[in-house]
């Protein structure tokens, strides 16, 4: 618990993202929690895991836990989006989270989805100079962000450019993407902690969680009129979901 009595809420981004995706909701969370948004290994400012370590959700969770311990945080509330939601669920499984709120988490599909035929990040990396110029055009920028948000026009131009270029430049993208597509989340024997699974009704990337992939007792919410990463679509709705999902005392 922070000096102001607020409990820590760890915020984890999705594949190709960075801690910046949480910027629209940080101020809304600060009245009730001590929000801490961090970059996952291989994204944003964080170096990837060691070459011999598969960047699976479980291994990313272990790395995040070590970072929390270094900051003096033992069992925070944890919230994540997409891959970050899966990492949050793995932290809960390992006993490293007091509660979990996962927004459109990856991994809750029926079976491993396999590798994509076309590596879009590789092509975008090769065309980076052209993409960078195109991002200054509002219409093109919003088209690039349309799978990310239901309302890309609500993402400020500077933030939109950072999102796309951050995805292109993420050194950990390939490995994490491969690992994500190779595994599924296993809810067997999940600890009895509060778990909220929230899905944007306009999510164009990931469908709702398969019933057999949901931890026993998990609460399921459908978030109206928002997409895969809804922090710009409706910051107030996202903040309320995170505050409600973490409305239990931090475990000792």
Where are these regions (language model features)?
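Hydrolases whose catalytic domains are alpha/beta-hydrolase-1, hotdog thioesterase
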Residues: 87-91
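Conserved loop-alpha-helix segment in the C-terminal half of the alpha/beta-hydrolase fold
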Residues: 27, 194-226, 232
């Amino acid at each position: 618990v922070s000096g102001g009595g607020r409990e820590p809420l760890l915020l984890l981004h999705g594949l190709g993202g960075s801690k910046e995706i949480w910027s629209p909701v940080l101020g809304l969370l600060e009245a009730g929690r001590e929000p801490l948004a961090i970059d996952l290994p291989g994204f944003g400012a964080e170096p990837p895991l060691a070459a011999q370590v598969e960047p699976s959700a479980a291994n990313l969770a272990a790395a995040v836990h070590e970072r929390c311990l270094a900051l003096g945080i033992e069992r925070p509330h944890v919230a994540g989006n997409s891959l970050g939601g899966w990492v949050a669920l793995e932290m809960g499984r390992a006993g490293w989270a007091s509660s979990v709120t996962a927004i459109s988490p990856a991994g809750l599909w029926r079976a491993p989805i396999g590798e994509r035929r076309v590596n879009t990040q590789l092509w975008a990396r090769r065309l980076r100079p052209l993409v960078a110029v195109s991002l200054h055009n509002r219409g093109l920028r919003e088209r690039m962000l349309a799978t990310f948000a239901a309302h890309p026009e609500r993402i400020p131009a500077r933030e939109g450019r950072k999102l796309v270029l951050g995805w292109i430049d993420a050194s950990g993208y390939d490995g994490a993407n491969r690992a994500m597509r190779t595994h599924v989340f296993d809810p067997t024997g999940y600890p009895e902690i509060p778990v909220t699974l929230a899905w944007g009704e306009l999510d164009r990337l990931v469908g709702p969680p398969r019933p057999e992939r949901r931890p026993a007792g998990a609460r399921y919410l459908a978030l109206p009129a928002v997409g895969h990463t809804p922090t710009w679509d409706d910051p107030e709705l996202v903040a309320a979901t995170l505050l409600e999902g973490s409305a239990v005392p931090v475990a000792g």
